[in-house]
Amino acid sequence: MLKLFSAFRKNKIWDFNGGIHPPEMKTQSNGTPLRQVPLAQRFVIPLKQHIGAEGELCVSVGDKVLRGQPLTRGRGKMLPVHAPTSGTVTAIAPHSTAHPSALAELSVIIDADGEDCWIPRDGWADYRSRSREELIERIHQFGVAGLGGAGFPTGVKLQGGGDKIETLIINAAECEPYITADDRLMQDCAAQVVEGIRILAHILQPREILIGIEDNKPQAISMLRAVLADSHDISLRVIPTKYPSGGAKQLTYILTGKQVPHGGRSSDIGVLMQNVGTAYAVKRAVIDGEPITERVVTLTGEAIARPGNVWARLGTPVRHLLNDAEFCPSADQMVIMGGPLMGFTLPWLDVPVVKITNCLLAPSANELGEPQEEQSCIRCSACADACPADLLPQQLYWFSKGQQHDKATTHNIADCIECGACAWVCPSNIPLVQYFRQEKAEIAAIRQEEKRAAEAKARFEARQARLEREKAARLERHKSAAVQPAAKDKDAIAAALARVKEKQAQATQPIVIKAGERPDNSAIIAAREARKAQARAKQAELQQTNDAATVADPRKTAVEAAIARAKARKLEQQQANAEPEEQIDPRKAAVEAAIARAKARKLEQQQANAEPEEQIDPRKAAVEAAIARAKARKLEQQQANAEPEEQIDPRKAAVEAAIARAKARKLEQQQANAEPEEQIDPRKAAVAAAIARVQAKKAAQQKVVNED
């Protein structure tokens, strides 16, 4: 450790394996100062311009916005975006963005009003009096992300560093050819960059602060040294020009001699790195109170007449910037966003500038050279020699091409920084970086699917466990309810058990009777009498119910009378056809006659108790009386014409007598209840009564004969 610290004091630097030295081509754009670009008419602001999820929209179509006004809310790793100028929100819809595949992402489209009015700005000039948490939250809510190309939220990165950061590294290497955005920013705004570095140091409290810059930027080195002349807490380290010395792991090793482990982060070894442009954005957010709405973009290439570095508002269409730089496209013109090694070709020029856009390269045909056809790998190992991450690009190429994801993961394809050094030196012109990007995307998709499947499985298992717990709790409640009755139920159960035990004791107790005495059966007799009384009461109640139902309906009574008459006729026919030798028991005939008289009296009572409002039609009564007289005449004729040897059936005679008496009484009641205006013929009534008396006398005489 002592040797390591002494090496730091001597400004010792280390060198990493691999790397290349391509033509720099930086002099095209780093010789002119930063300039402003006229406002575009329309701005397209994608909601996601960083690593992580997009924020929540807080504006709607038709809203008036000011420059710096939040368009989304930032929570967690969601970084907000802000309006680049004042104007009106005309649409919120998907739009193609800065992506190798030009994927469409949800964007806010603003029509500028030309006034470019800011929101009220509240700067914290005394930021040292603010807490660490307040500063980190302000940096996050003002939309600051890594401007070196990764786009990781700066606030989240500072929060994750915590108290374990010992070394703060400011990346000023800018190693890729053509790009001079950081170089020009340090030349024109060195004091503001250093102020942003001091804010980061105040938040992290590291033991040392290192600025790493390549030796191909002499003007920027001079400006930084001038600003840091009286500072002893910040060290400026000039390193040799080598690509890709600006990589995070490579620059960390160059300045500290420490290597970031495979699959790890620089914070694991106590190092945190920020870009020069990010430090400048932190200064504007904290001290000036300005959210990030613009950044420095390099416009370069031989197809551009006015190359240089400009302040480009976020959301400005690429076409607008190129036109301002006097873009002269050829027939098959190519425009690259980023550098020639790590950038990607734009499918069209309507994509907007975002936070990670640091360069727009429009090369001529001479700069690009003739397109080379991809050849087969010759296993020369030049790619392995040039790889700064100590990987085996040749093996990764075969694994990627053969869809062998497990082997590619085992060979640490995730550590590939996609610098393009392997593709630069490949004699077979194999686009290795494209294969590696595709392979990493496929592996990420597979892991995402596995994660979703694991989450779904966890949710299913949690649901099953919850259902099992609920079932067990439900069974336990039922069991408790069955075993533990309420207090009143317990008392009732105890009383019932006591009665049962008492009865059992009485049943098992022997009855002792002394000699000459009788057992006391009074209790048994009383119980028997009580049961009989209860049965009689129930029978009487049932009989009253039936009688009430019968009396309440006079129609039913009439129907029953008709049925009785039909049964009587049928009985007469059966007796007439019966054999003469079969004699009828006179006692049975008397019993049946008595039953008939009882039924007749019951019928009279029912008719007398019938509802008064139901009046008997006198016409019907007269008709029935006529029918009765006709039947009587017919019966007399049959008896007169009968053979002397045929004996009269006493049962039939008794029934007919009972029916005749019932009809006579019914006729009398009907006549008594008839309307006064409808008078009955007294002669007919007298005749009917005489006939009834004659029939009754005959029946009585026949009964006497039978008894003799």
UniProtKB/Swiss-Prot annotation:
GO MF annotation, one: metal ion binding
Main localization (coarse): membrane
Stored InterPro entries: 4Fe4S_Fe-S-bd, 4Fe4S_Fe_S_CS, Ion_transpt_RnfC/RsxC, Nuo51_FMN-bd, Nuo51_FMN-bd_sf, RnfC_N
NCBIfam families: PRK05035.1 (NF003454), rnfC (TIGR01945)
Keyword set, alphabetical order: 4Fe-4S, Cell inner membrane, Cell membrane, Electron transport, Iron, Iron-sulfur, Membrane, Metal-binding, Repeat, Translocase, Transport
Entry EC number(s): 7.-.-.-
Gene Ontology biological-process annotations: electron transport chain
Gene3D superfamilies listed in its UniProt record: 3.30.70.20, NADH-ubiquinone oxidoreductase 51kDa subunit
Subcellular location: Cell inner membrane
Residues that bind [4Fe-4S] cluster 2: 387, 416, 419, 422
Keyword Cell inner membrane: yes
Domain 4Fe-4S ferredoxin-type: 369-397, 407-436
HAMAP family: RsxC_RnfC
Cofactor: [4Fe-4S] cluster
Signal peptide: none
UniProt GO cellular component terms: plasma membrane
UniProt binding sites for [4Fe-4S] cluster 1: 377, 380, 383, 426
Oligomeric form and interacting partners: The complex is composed of six subunits: RsxA, RsxB, RsxC, RsxD, RsxE and RsxG.
Record's keyword annotation contains 4Fe-4S: yes
Designated name of the protein: Ion-translocating oxidoreductase complex subunit C
